[in-house]
UniProtKB/Swiss-Prot annotation:
Function as written in the Swiss-Prot or TrEMBL entry: G protein-coupled receptor for peptide hormones apelin (apln) and apelin receptor early endogenous ligand (apela), that plays a role in the regulation of normal cardiovascular function and fluid homeostasis. When acting as apelin receptor, activates both G(i) protein pathway that inhibits adenylate cyclase activity, and the beta-arrestin pathway that promotes internalization of the receptor. Also functions as mechanoreceptor that is activated by pathological stimuli in a G-protein-independent fashion to induce beta-arrestin signaling, hence eliciting cardiac hypertrophy.
Extracellular face of the membrane: 1-39, 100-112, 175-201, 272-298
Gene Ontology MF terms in the entry: apelin receptor activity; G protein-coupled peptide receptor activity; mechanoreceptor activity
Domain of life: Eukaryota
Glycosylation sites: N21, N183
Gene Ontology terms describing biological process: angiogenesis; apelin receptor signaling pathway; coronary vasculature development; G protein-coupled receptor signaling pathway; gastrulation; heart development; negative regulation of cAMP-mediated signaling; positive regulation of angiogenesis
Keywords per UniProt: Angiogenesis, Cell membrane, Developmental protein, Differentiation, Disulfide bond, G-protein coupled receptor, Gastrulation, Glycoprotein, Membrane, Receptor, Transducer, Transmembrane, Transmembrane helix
InterPro entries: ATII_rcpt, CCR1-9-like, GPCR_Rhodpsn, GPCR_Rhodpsn_7TM
Designated name of the protein: Apelin receptor
Organism: Xenopus tropicalis (Western clawed frog)
Topology in membrane: Multi-pass membrane protein
Gene that this polypeptide is encoded by: aplnr
Membrane side Cytoplasmic: residue ranges: 61-78, 134-153, 223-250, 320-364
Length: 364
């Protein structure tokens, strides 16, 4: 496929932009997609298997722990739900790529799958932002934030997250469609119903800003501000942390890890998209070789973003003793949990171990 024909059809991308020659840019050399046809489907299926199983376990564990669920757990469960909604579309995109960007599934699935991809992106970053805000309230305003962290407030915030995410992703549902190009049917952005050819670049640019600003930059700025305040608070009281505050600090480390990994996974994608946007609008004048590099790197930057959807459950398992304990407890691995506790503190009596098992599986 030639570079000047490369469009948002080439990946299940978070997708409001286009690498086409309709921008008035000179035609460039061809880009060889043979490696992508073979490599990307395998990668998609690995993410699908890990994401489906890992996020499924998270959702089940959070659901089973309802009586003692932390406010953070509710956001974590919804983060897993957003990731799960995305990874179930990956077999379709794997098939699409393996067939040389040929979409055999019809217009409805083209629209729905693209919509779920964008819905995941927005819902994930908004859940992480709310997690960060929840930790900010719990640590910086622990005495005065009870009402804001109540169950009803959390449910309202989740409703706003999903509604706002659904609205921001809606252009993908409207604009994505199938079209025939040569021997292939591709799933692509179609602006013919809303714009003339001359104004398509403005739509692409506007939608690109829509994904980058509320979908990455603004949430990342808010999370950075929250953690600056949290860092100041924790530093001031580091020597006098009570047991409850130590638990908050452990949970804080987990959430910071989630945010950092999210930023690392998404940053290359947004950098490439921003460079393309600036080139498209005439703020940059990229050579053909540079355009080809951007085009070639884009599917792999998108894949790095996809990794985030299957990494989170493994981060919980690695960093959060409480989550591991809940998994052991709810899936019936009580002997394994007892062994884990025995290694941690061999002096515990049998009765204490039994109590600790239940405590780890249900409490903060």
């Amino acid at each position: 496929m030639a570079t000047d024909e490369f469009s948002s059809s080439t990946t299940p991308s978070y997708d409001y932009y286009d690498y086409t020659n309709e921008s008035g840019l000179p035609p460039c050399d061809e880009t060889d997609w043979d490696l992508s046809y073979s490599l990307l489907p395998v990668f998609y299926m690995i993410v699908f298997v890990l994401g489906l199983s890992g996020n499924g376990v998270v959702i089940f564990t959070v659901w089973k722990a309802k009586p003692k669920r932390r406010s953070a757990d509710t956001y974590i469960g919804n983060l897993a739900l957003a990731d799960l909604a995305f990874v179930v579309t990956l077999p379709l995109w794997a098939t699409y790529t393996a067939l040389g960007f040929h979409w055999p599934f019809g217009s409805a699935l083209c629209k729905l799958s693209s919509y779920l991809v964008l819905l995941n992106m927005f819902a994930s970053v908004f859940c992480l932002t709310c997690l960060s805000f929840d930790r900010y309230l719990a640590i910086v305003h622990s005495l005065s934030s009870a009402k804001l962290r109540s169950r009803s407030s959390i449910l309202v915030s989740l409703a706003v997250i999903w509604l706002f995410s659904g609205l921001l992703a809606l252009p993908s549902l409207i604009l994505r469609d199938t079209r025939v190009e040569g021997n292939n049917t591709i799933c692509d952005l179609d602006f013919s119903g809303v714009s003339s050819k001359e104004n398509e670049n403005f739509w692409i640019g506007g939608l690109s800003i829509l994904t980058t600003v509320p979908g990455f930059l603004l949430p990342l700025l808010l999370m950075t501000i929250f953690y600056c305040f949290i860092g100041g608070k924790v530093t001031m009281h580091f020597q006098n942390l009570k047991k409850e505050e130590q638990k908050k600090k452990r949970l804080l480390k987990i959430i910071i890890t989630l945010v950092v990994v999210f930023a690392i996974c998404w940053l290359p994608f947004h950098i490439l998209k921003t460079i393309h946007f600036l080139d498209l609008m005439g703020f940059l004048e990229l050579s053909c070789s540079t355009q080809n590099i951007i085009v070639s790197l884009h599917p792999y930057a998108t894949c790095l973003a996809y990794i985030n959807s299957c990494l989170n459950p493994f981060l919980y398992a690695f960093f959060d003793l409480r989550f591991r304990s809940q998994c052991f407890f709810f899936f019936g691995f009580k002997k394994a949990l007892q062994g884990h506790l025995s290694n941690t503190s061999s002096s515990l009596s049998a009765q204490t171990q039994k109590s600790e098992i239940h405590s780890l599986a249900t409490k903060v």
